[in-house]
Curated annotation (Swiss-Prot):
Taxonomic lineage: Eukaryota, Fungi, Dikarya, Ascomycota, Pezizomycotina
Family annotation (InterPro entries): CTU2, Rossmann-like_a/b/a_fold
UniProt key word tRNA processing: yes
Family assignment from sequence similarity: Belongs to the CTU2/NCS2 family.
GO biological process, one term: protein urmylation
Keywords: Cytoplasm, tRNA processing
Pathway recorded for this protein: tRNA modification; 5-methoxycarbonylmethyl-2-thiouridine-tRNA biosynthesis
Entry GO MF terms: nucleotidyltransferase activity; sulfurtransferase activity; tRNA binding
An annotated GO cellular component: cytosol
Entries under HAMAP family matching the protein: CTU2
Protein name (record): Cytoplasmic tRNA 2-thiolation protein 2
Amino acid sequence: MAPPNTKESQLPGEQPTALCKRCNEVQATLQIRSESVCQKCFLQYIKTKAVKRMETYKGKRSTKVPQKLLLPLSFGPSSSCLLHMLDGYLGIQHERMNRVSYELFVVHIDLYLDDADREASAARLQKYKDQYPRHSYSSYGLHEALQLEGIDWQSLGISDLPTQDTKASSFDLQKIVSSLSSATSRADIVSTLLNRLLVDVAKRNDCESILFGDTTTRLAEKTLTETAKGRGFSLPWQVSDGPSPYGIGFLYPLRDILKKEIMTFSTSFSPLPELVVHQAPPSHISASSKSTTIDDLMAQYFESVEENFPSIVANVAVEFAGFLSQRALMASMVGVEIKIQIHGHQEKTLIQILFYAMDAQDLSTDESARP
């Protein structure tokens, strides 16, 4: 006897069960953009996006010598999911071919920690080591960035630095950051020091590139944030895959995945729920608050937009980054206004491009539009 169909088996007044839009076999419980899908199809979609992006990084290099790549691990959803996905992919590679195309150097940077916090951080890092043992791991304190060479401290508004003869401490870092006048300035200096320390660690450990866990949503946030701060010239390496001015590659393997999709992944698939540290969801942020940063406002904006309009988020990150990556770099070198041509339209300046991208065709699932 044939199994009863959904309509016949449902109770009076009960809504019909929706099937997965991809396999049409299993009940849909999760979302990909605006599609309702089952867990299996969701997992396949997310993993495929990250792995396909990683495959584009290999280029023409010899596959016999694995690339060494640094993966910054914050214990948050994005970096944890990236590590989980790449660990699984490398395991399959090794099983099939007895070799891997790249090896991961996983680095955790502690921000402001006392001894007790540092012990808790080390214990959590050990959990990741136990779960994903094929990789090498290391941790550093952000205060170590205070003794890096080649940073223009004066341009950052910092003068009271520890001497080279004195070992920097987390207290020194807190003192410097708290001396800055605005919340945005404080967030900026932490972000700058974090990136410069990661670059230094990557170079000292012979890594070719850094794998950042930035999602489509995060890249869209950075695009508007850096533009608002007058730093549009930095977008080619802040949102696009490729070389950075620091002599090492910046890569974004999760660039085709929305933040809300990563959040779902991190809470739905073992062992991530036991490993990931989730930040408390932000309450409504007031633009007039002294503790509010530009980054906070952009994050709040895109968090509300991606829920119902994922194409807007994708268009900002995908279309803008793709067109900007080459021309903005050349423009910034000669100090001219950034202008580019889009779809045969008249030239548009940096800000105009952003709003054009928001109103463009839906590129959120268009593979041909990916940079």
